[in-house]
């Protein structure tokens, strides 16, 4: 990393402001973040220092902000892409402990904080991205629900914590992209909270909002009642996106065991959901059976009442015919009273007939609903049986892999013991070889000495032989 340039002797307000901005974002403006395939590249910028030159140009602050926007956009691309791929490979609902999801929220928090204006309060200056997020409910009415939920959470005490909770609820609602697009399109409202060259005010913000659409395929579930969102430190972990050339792949057996464990957990979770659904459907079937029995009883009572009314109607008809004949000779007022009584009886009969039709229609509806529930129960039972068979098969595979792992470990221990024994034997053989080599050298030296002695004796003998002659 290049050395930091020393500060100038006479700082100005402009240089102090630029220095403060560079100090806050040293991890962004000191490097250029770019993408190489699926990996993150950090390239050092030798021409950027914490303190600008004594005579800075007007383009330096804009250059720093543009570099920060580009870095944040590339980080957002990598974070979103990695989150989608890992979530699809995982194949289950994500929670707050999932590391790629945590890093995504950290990157989004940095994007929302970029170029944020400081609000002056009696405690000092405060930068919070909760203010812009509160505007979303005015632009998209659906966001009012999560805003109210965030405000009602008892554990949140700071605007930063509320903003983090809002991001999590929007992701759970699968509306984060829609909310961000609506917010970015209203730059006249954002100008109250952001500088003119902030990420949310430039093209990079719109690009990030478009990338967020891909997160709609992810299912996430957060429990924020016990989570401390106020005091979390939002630091981007670059190690998740940097390629390690010396990294070695795990053993194939461990990878298979991990995959089978994930499948087993998924099947068990699915089995629990299916069992809960079956229990709910069974409760509904019991309730429908009780309702059906009650409706059958009411229908029987209504049929008996209809029969009684029909008999009464026949009797009333006979009486009315008799009264008509008798009243032809009677006063006109009596005939009018009898006509009114007959009209009331007909009206009452019509109401009872309509009631019977309504009861029969309700009974048919309940019967059809019961048949549908029975069919759904059969299908769910079949699905549960299939999932249980798959679970048994996965458990068997897991047991086989564990046995294979133990066998390989035992063989490895045995081979290590054999290697150790062979090493000891080899050491002994080398020691004996060294001893034999030393003995051979001694024997050779002795042989040389004997040869010398033989030569000496021979020469002495040759000298003695002439003397005797």
From Swiss-Prot:
Q: Per its record, how is this protein called by name?
A: Protein RUFY3
Per the record, its GO cellular-component terms are:
anchoring junction; axon; cytoplasm; dendrite; endolysosome; filopodium; growth cone; lamellipodium
Residues modified as Phosphoserine: 34, 49
Q: What induces it?
A: Up-regulated during neuronal polarization.
Modified sites of kind Phosphothreonine: 5, 12, 51
Which lineage is the organism of this entry classified under, starting from the top rank? Eukaryota, Metazoa, Chordata, Craniata, Vertebrata
Cell compartments where the protein resides? Cytoplasm; Endomembrane system; Cell projection, Invadopodium; Cell projection, Growth cone
**Which additional comment does the entry carry?**
Hippocampal neurons with reduced levels of RUFY3 show an increase in formation of additional axons. This effect is suppressed in the presence of the PI3K inhibitor LY294002 and enhanced by overexpression of SHTN1. Overexpression of RUFY3 suppresses additional axons formed upon overexpression of SHTN1.
Organism from which the protein derives: Rattus norvegicus (Rat)
Domain of life, per the record? Eukaryota
The written remark on domains in the entry is: The second coiled coil domain is involved in the interaction with GTP-bound ARL8B.
Which purpose does this protein serve, as stated in its record?
A: ARL8 effector that promotes the coupling of endolysosomes to dynein-dynactin for retrograde transport along microtubules. Acts by binding both GTP-bound ARL8 and dynein-dynactin. In nonneuronal cells, promotes concentration of endolysosomes in the juxtanuclear area. In hippocampal neurons, drives retrograde transport of endolysosomes from the axon to the soma. Plays a role in the generation of neuronal polarity formation and axon growth. Implicated in the formation of a single axon by developing neurons.
Domain (RUN) ranges: 95-227
A Gene Ontology annotation in the biological process aspect, one of them, is: regulation of establishment of cell polarity
Q: Which Pfam families match?
A: RUN (PF02759)
């Amino acid at each position: 990393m290049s050395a930091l340039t020393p500060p100038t002797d006479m700082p100005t307000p402009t240089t102090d402001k630029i220095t403060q901005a560079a100090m806050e974002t040293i991890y962004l403006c000191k490097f250029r973040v770019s993408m190489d395939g699926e990996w993150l590249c950090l390239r050092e910028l030798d021409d950027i220092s914490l303190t600008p030159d004594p005579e800075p140009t007007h383009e330096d602050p804009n250059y720093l902000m543009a570099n920060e926007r580009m870095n944040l956009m590339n980080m957002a691309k990598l974070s979103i892409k990695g989150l989608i791929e890992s979530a699809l490979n995982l194949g289950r609902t994500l929670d707050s402990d999932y590391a790629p999801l945590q890093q995504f929220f950290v990157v989004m928090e940095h994007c929302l904080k970029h170029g944020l204006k400081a609000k002056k309060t009696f405690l000092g200056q405060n930068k919070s991205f909760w203010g812009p997020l509160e505007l979303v409910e005015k632009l998209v009415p659906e966001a009012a629900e999560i805003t109210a939920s965030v405000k009602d959470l008892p554990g949140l005490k700071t605007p930063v914590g509320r903003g983090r909770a809002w991001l999590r609820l929007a992701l759970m609602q699968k509306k984060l992209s829609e909310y961000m697009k609506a917010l970015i399109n209203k730059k006249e409202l954002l100008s109250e909270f952001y500088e003119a060259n902030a990420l949310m005010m430039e093209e990079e913000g719109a690009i990030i909002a478009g990338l967020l659409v891909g997160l709609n395929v992810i299912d996430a579930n957060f429990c924020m009642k016990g989570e401390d969102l106020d005091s979390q430190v939002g630091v981007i972990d670059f190690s998740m996106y940097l390629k390690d050339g010396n990294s070695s792949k795990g053993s194939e057996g461990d990878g298979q065991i991990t995959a089978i464990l994930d499948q087993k957990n998924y099947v068990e979770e699915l089995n629990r959901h299916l069992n809960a659904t079956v229990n709910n459907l069974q409760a509904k079937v019991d309730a429908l059976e009780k309702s059906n029995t009650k409706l059958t009883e009411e229908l029987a009572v209504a049929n008996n009442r209809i029969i009684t009314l029909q008999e009464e109607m026949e009797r009333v008809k006979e009486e009315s015919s008799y009264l008509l004949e008798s009243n032809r000779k009677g006063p006109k007022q009596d005939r009018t009273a009898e006509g009114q009584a007959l009209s009331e009886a007909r009206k009452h009969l019509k109401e009872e007939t309509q009631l019977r039709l309504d009861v029969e229609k309700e009974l048919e509806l309940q019967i059809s609903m019961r048949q549908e529930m029975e069919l759904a129960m059969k299908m769910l039972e079949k699905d549960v049986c299939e999932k249980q068979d798959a679970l048994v098969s996965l458990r068997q595979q897991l047991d086989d892999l564990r046995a294979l792992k133990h066998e390989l470990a035992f063989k490895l221990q045995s081979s290590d013991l054999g290697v150790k024994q062979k090493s000891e034997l080899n050491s002994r053989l080398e020691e004996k070889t060294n001893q034999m080599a030393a003995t051979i050298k001694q024997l050779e030296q002795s042989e040389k000495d004997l040869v010398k002695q033989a030569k000496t004796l021979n020469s002495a003998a040759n000298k003695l032989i002439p003397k005797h002659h």
